[in-house]
Amino acid sequence: PAGLQLGGAWGLILGSLLTLVTALALGSGQIAGPGHWVGGSRTDAGGLFLLGWSRSGGDLRVPHFFATHIMQALPIVGLVFDVVAPRLVSAGLLAAGTLSVTVVAATFAQAVAGRPFF
């Protein structure tokens, strides 16, 4: 199916690029700074249930999580469009890709500003 192939290709491209960017930010903090924390307490105690993301300051693991999972989300979106609306595969994937990049950029900016995800 075209949507699955296109979603897989764009998922790998966008997901890899954004994961690399967020991983570099995480890695630089591990060496020269406070790790994945930005502001707030430097502990995972009291973090968000199941994920452990900081609730007192920014956490660079949040945008990294969303960037990594673009690789799985876009092929699924493409497959759904293949089944539900094959004529809208390209437009649907463009919208999903744009939304994904926006979510990663917004959560990255939020983390760098020292604001918690929740």
Q: Where does each model-flagged region fall?
A:
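Interfacial helix-loop-helix junctions of multi-pass membrane proteins
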Residues: 29-33, 107-118
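Membrane-interfacial alpha-helical segments at the cytosolic side of multi-pass membrane proteins
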Residues: 72-85
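Membrane-interfacial catalytic/cofactor-binding modules of polytopic membrane enzymes
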Residues: 26-70
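Final/C-terminal transmembrane alpha-helix of multipass membrane proteins
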Residues: 16-17, 94-112
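Membrane-water interface at transmembrane helix exits
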Residues: 22, 26, 78-81, 106-110
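Polytopic transmembrane helical bundles with strong interfacial aromatic enrichment
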Residues: 10-35
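Interfacial segments of alpha-helical transmembrane regions
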Residues: 1-18, 89-97
